[in-house]
Amino acid sequence: MNERDRKKHTTPSRLDTSSLPRGPLNWVFFPAALLYHELLLRAFDRQSTFFTGTLVLVVLFALGAGLFWSLLINLFRHRRAATIASIAATALWTVLVCVEYCCRSYFKSYFALSFIGNMAGDVVGGFGDTVLPDVVLPRLPFILLAFVPLALCILLRRRIVTEQRMGRWSLLFLLVVCLLFGGIGSGLARWGTYHDAYTYNFTTDTGVTHFGLNASARLEITYAIFGHPSPRLPDTGTNTDVPDNTPVVTTPVVYGENT
């Protein structure tokens, strides 16, 4: 009887622990995958230096955006829908990373999302035969490395999207940390050295180089909807409305000496 009672008490605990996630992949995977892609894109970019002050901004924006995606995926109450959304988002992002790298290495510039969308039809119909041998195959090592997170997302999908969904406090924690990373990165970029590249003088080429691909895509969409910020006017420190009461000093004219 004692052994049966022990089995009854131990069986529910085993069932409960088996349904728990075996690791923090349900919220760590997307920040790690996004940071991996950003660092990979930066490492293969021969036109920019890897270790610069902007590396901090790239890391902050990547972690913030990755935690945001983890939050969105964990908001799905159905595991199947969350799995499909996570794989689809990772696949689309991977394709964008590969396309931007090919544009950077072949055309020497990162292209805007709108330009890539408009150019996609021309590439396939116009010179699609030359894309594979001239653009894709020489950059195959980068493309294979870029698809590593997608392969892991498919293989580890049961550990990334677990049966037990996150609770409210866990989701709130993700939101706070996401806003913390994003807020620090935005503050450093907006009021730092690269203020002009982050605001009124933003371009995709400089944006990806200084802030990362995910931050550049976010800024491009934001400025397309709300417009670019206006540049700051220089502060002259003088007020033209206040009259100048300084007495005028005149030099007396003495004929024969001032000529």
Roles of regions detected by a PLM:
Residues 2-7, 12-225:
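Transmembrane and membrane-interface helices of multi-pass
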Residues 207-259:
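Soluble catalytic regions of membrane-associated enzymes that act on cell-envelope
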